[in-house]
Swiss-Prot record:
Description of post-translational modifications: Tyrosine phosphorylated.
One Gene Ontology MF term: NAD binding
Annotated active site: H487 (proton acceptor)
CC cofactor: FAD
Source taxonomy: Eukaryota, Metazoa, Chordata, Craniata, Vertebrata
Gene behind this protein: Dld
Family in the record: Belongs to the class-I pyridine nucleotide-disulfide oxidoreductase family.
Protein known as: Dihydrolipoyl dehydrogenase, mitochondrial
Length: 509
């Protein structure tokens, strides 16, 4: 990937900044939320302010482009910040604290609390506070970087024009040299089940329940299903996840890790019905919901009764009413916008990134695409190695991986070796009395190059970034094994697993 400093130097030599600075003076006088009879002129117009969109807008402005970002919602940050990644992590963190205090964990550490009570409204208030601070932070960054924020639904009304429309019908026209679509994704509906965000909820509703349900059924045991199911299970709900596939954790997870992960969640009280499909859901007169299920291959029907039904079978690209059809931009069979390696659509000055294009629907993937996309507009190199994009499940313990799984390597016919190290043998995990899980490293059998890293355990979401860096630089298992890691730390388990992969045995197990 071409470094950002080179892009800046390249632009400076071309006089790009001087040429655009005059335009930026005009942009700085435009309010963050503006509607006028006069069109706004821009070099780059970003539709959507989620992780991909807002980062792309800021980067474009930093590169000297006169930049506009259009957002249909009142707050910036998209799904991730408002009703996704951020609020779910607040609830996951706080529900974990409650679980430790309410169960036997604290007592086993010599911390005796006579009575632990859940104040759900206070917990939700802390979640909202975190979201508000971060959405306000984006608004501040826009102002600081002179990104013009236009509130409204953005539609491409010409190859060089975007029109933003508010709920009251007011419009703002933006004339623009480049258009970047970063509209993200939306919840995939379940045929025959209507979401009311009260007792039949999507991930959005599950983040704002008014009380802890007695019984919760989750359709889908992927990342979102196990995360949100964990929140309410910790807070006292009886949770059952119904999953069509034969494993938990979604697509891409290593099967050995998945089996161990499922075992740990079940030990916590989480129930699973795998290889099972939901055939319908009926609300009863008493407010409860009968969920009809049967084996994925067909068979005897069964009914599970619950207070709340959470539908999380995935997400789909949000591309409706963007004006793509009028421009002749056709979607692929999965509803995604086809782009080339520079994120250009069939119309060269219209780009797309994030959940609306191919690849994993991850916030950090969208951020990377946003940055390199606008660097490409400025003449920089455009490259991203999707094999180095990590995935994380923020349960406790966490699950994280980057690179290939064992199943993928077998399917591709790649010869590999495996190194494992359990957290039960890690000093820091022992002192923390938090020893579930392991680190699993997959290395090339002859070259020793790291091909994949799979972590189940405390702090996996942080540790996986060391693995991502190693993969990005093409490191061998021995390279990591010979890097001195501080003691006692959880990351020593990562080093030990690489020792096991490279030399056949770890030191401490």
């Amino acid at each position: 990937m071409q470094s950002w400093s080179r892009v800046y130097c390249s632009l400076a030599k071309k006089g790009h900044f001087n040429r655009l600075s005059h335009g930026l003076q005009g942009a700085s006088s435009v309010p963050l939320r503006t509607y006028s009879d006069q069109p706004i002129d821009a070099d780059v117009t970003v539709i959507g302010s989620g992780p991909g969109g807002y980062v792309a807008a800021i980067k474009a402005a930093q590169l000297g482009f006169k930049t506009v970002c259009i957002e249909k919602n009142e707050t910036l940050g998209g799904t991730c910040l408002n009703v996704g990644c951020i609020p779910s992590k607040a609830l996951l963190n706080n529900s974990h604290y409650y679980h430790l205090a309410h169960g036997k964990d604290f007592a086993s550490r010599g911390i005796e609390i006579p009575e632990v009570r859940l104040n759900l409204e206070k917990m939700m208030e802390q979640k909202r506070s975190a979201v508000k601070a971060l959405t306000g932070g984006i608004a501040h960054l826009f102002k600081q970087n002179k990104v013009v924020h236009v509130n409204g639904f953005g539609k491409i009304t010409g190859k060089n024009q975007v029109t933003a429309t508010t709920a009251d019908g007011s419009t703002q026209v933006i004339g623009t040299k480049n258009i970047l679509i970063a509209t993200g994704s939306e919840v995939t509906p379940f045929p025959g089940i209507t979401i009311d965000e009260d007792t039949i909820v999507s991930s959005t509703g599950a983040l704002s329940l008014k009380k802890v349900p007695e019984k919760l059924v989750v359709i889908g045991a992927g990342v979102i299903g196990v995360e949100l199911g964990s929140v309410w299970q910790r807070l006292g709900a009886d949770v059952t996840a119904v999953e069509f596939l034969g494993h938990v954790g979604g697509i891409g997870i290593d099967m050995e890790i998945s089996k161990n992960f499922q075992r740990i969640l079940q030990k916590q009280g989480f129930k699973f019905k795998l290889n099972t499909k939901v055939t319908g859901a009926t609300k009863k007169s008493d407010g409860k919901i009968d969920v009809s299920v049967e084996a994925a291959s067909g068979g005897k029907a069964e009914v599970i009764t619950c207070d709340v039904l959470l539908v999380c079978i995935g997400r789909r690209p949000f591309t409706q009413n963007l004006g793509l059809e009028e421009l002749g931009i056709e979607l692929d069979p999965k509803g995604r916008i086809p782009v080339n390696t520079r994120f250009q659509t069939k119309i060269p000055n219209i780009f797309a990134i994030g959940d609306v294009v191919a690849g994993p629907m991850l916030a950090h993937k969208a951020e990377d695409e946003g940055i390199i996309c606008v660097e490409g507009m400025a003449g920089g190199a455009v490259h991203i190695d999707y094999n180095c994009v990590p995935s994380v499940i923020y349960t406790h313990p966490e699950v994280a991986w980057v690179g290939k799984s064992e199943e993928q390597l077998k399917e591709e016919g790649v010869e590999f070796k495996v190194g494992k190290f359990p957290f039960a043998a890690n000093s820091r995990a022992k002192t923390n009395a938090d020893t579930d899980g392991m680190v699993k490293i997959l290395g090339h059998k002859s070259t020793d190059r790291i091909l994949g890293a799979h972590i189940l355990g405390p702090g996996a979401g942080e540790m996986v970034n060391e693995a991502a860096l190693a993969l990005e630089y093409g490191a061998s298992c021995e390279d990591v094994a010979r890097v001195c890691h501080a003691h006692p730390t959880l990351s020593e388990a990562f080093r030990e697993a690489n020792l096991a992969a490279s030399f056949g045995k770890p030191i401490n197990f």
